[in-house]
């Protein structure tokens, strides 16, 4: 009863922090054991004294203790299990957090699989509007006396005017514009998709897009528009040449916009699609595999098009010196591969109960005399067998390093490990793990069989235990088997331009299992002279269990090889082999499960699974290459624009983000900079280079169309009169710098030498500071007088900061508040500054009207394999590369 009181009080204690909760979970195990003892004592006292149970109430805390406190031993054990499970889950969460912190690019598996499957050809690039930087805008015209005229004039202005001030920032703006164009650059343009009706047309004609239609509408309604232009707009319509599948649409575009769109139209990525292309798109080994029956739909329209995937190989060599990046790529490939490896379901495996019963009979475990032999049956289940099968194939497909987990005293695990090391190349295992497993096999099975002393292996020895043992063992069959394992490596073969890691032919056809069995038989016949009889008997029975399944092991090896090679045909990136930062754990008990439970049912990937795996690989690979092209282009553009402050690391970060699978903040800096250096060495792709040259040639025109910045300022010691300008009225503006001494503002900021400006001004010589400056307008004459002189020159000379330079544009015209004050009193305002602003390009309808040509219609297919219907032969009849059934043991 005392226990109950204590328990009740403990439950009512306030939980001050999370640490107390953790301590409670850990202490619960001890408390539960105490519960057992107390309950037993309670039962005894109840039997002796009374059958009634008292309910003790703690008056002070008002806590009621329920009748059900007395629990059965079954309930207690259940509670104990729950506590232990909670503790185990908590430890897993802690390990998960540690993993997240230590592995730079670690992410949960489900999210990685979703990310890699969601990478698809970018259908968003199907344009519904033409690409435009400029739009025409109406501006008033001012007479010589500053009064506004009734007529207007059209100029080309920026659609989105976000130009910053400062030459460097302007160049950075152009880099961002370039990046935006690269993202928006269409793979193909079909003008018919974006064409809209021309409202002013006589016969329901169409123009190329909605913006062209709205411009035509505005010009048509403008009173200043000439009659001939109105008649022309009324006649604007598409011209169709159906026999050539061509259509021409009228468009109104700035010459620079026209150059971009014309380039996009002439350099589309779509190519004609026919049955031969689809046939060649299917991996050759799948086409030639007699287990798959493929049929193709022959009814492809002549207008069918496709975008060829960009499958260039190894341009960055991410396997070389990019440990965390490579780890993430192999992890995502592993997770993807696991999702496509066929499952060994329970109906394909031998019944676990029946098999364990048979093994028990073989081991003669009725007496259960030897503890070690009971371990042979531990952990054998169909789930572990399936997990092992998927892990082995997925790890080889993704070239993920595996680490082995085993107990040395479980001889059955070690004997299963001998099969594993025989069929899986050594490269696939973590070196330390491989050495530990080999050493356990040598010291537990091989050396004791021949009465040899234990091998004392020196850590760091270049030779593995099996390599040392091969030289010391005299028995031919065992030495021959060791020799095979020591030389079991992947063969690198280039198939269809892709580097494949292929298995040894002896493994593919399963003959190596006979070699393994010969070695095992030799070992079981040995006397184990230095070991007790029970030890010898345990090893022999373990070998007997495996050798009884010789036929199934041959079939399993052939099945493993076939599934690996069939799925490998769907891989498009070179299979580079490098040990990975993290490993996939493999329990040797699960290998035992696979060896003991494999049945005679053949499982091969379904055609739909293969096509899905192939499509995901193609999409990821193509996206990877396109993002490389973007990053290389941006790095080259940043260098050519002389963006010396641009952090190249940010470009590399954007590149990795666009690959979808990386957790960019966790990638170490050294790998970021190494990646930058690799990207710098690559050439720029042709389309991207041409687009950049178009921007480079027209930077001045784009800058000129902005209302946010001026191109410089002229500073004088004496006042200068305001001049008449058709666009603004009377202004302190100049359209030319001829006759002025010019100083570059960016150079001035970098050197900080203001002496030259001061000397020139003191000598009464005006000086022109050239650079992108904020274009501030102020039309109030009163504020103009207040800010005069002190605005520009005094501040920059005093503070030595050019970035504070904000020359004000003084506009005096009939729109300004004080225009009549100036006009009536013949006041001629002056200023010590003149803003240098280039004239935007006037809108000329005739020069802006362009005919754009594209195909009248075509259909772009992104999934070529949707045309292929596929089926498989009956799995029992499926044959391997040697024209024999994959699984012969029926």
From Swiss-Prot:
Give the UniProt keywords, A-Z.
Capsid protein, Inner capsid protein, Repeat, RNA-binding, T=2 icosahedral capsid protein, Ubl conjugation, Virion
Cellular component, GO annotation: T=2 icosahedral viral capsid; viral inner capsid; viral nucleocapsid
Any idea which GO molecular function terms this record carries? RNA binding
Is the keyword Repeat in the record?
yes
Predominant location: virion
Region (Hydrophobic) location:
404-424, 432-452
| Bias kind Polar residues: ranges | 28-42
UniProt keyword RNA-binding, yes or no: yes
Free-text note regarding domains? The N-terminus binds RNA. It is necessary for encapsidation of VP1 and VP3. The N-termini of 10 VP2 molecules form a cylindrical hub underneath each 5-fold axis of the inner capsid.
Function of the molecule: Inner capsid protein that self-assembles to form an icosahedral capsid with a T=2 symmetry, which consists of 120 copies of VP2, with channels at each of its five-fold vertices. This capsid constitutes the innermost concentric layer of the viral mature particle. It encapsidates the polymerase VP1, the capping enzyme VP3 and the genomic dsRNA, thereby defining the core.
Provide the family line.
Answer: Belongs to the rotavirus VP2 family.
What name is this protein filed under? Answer: Inner capsid protein VP2
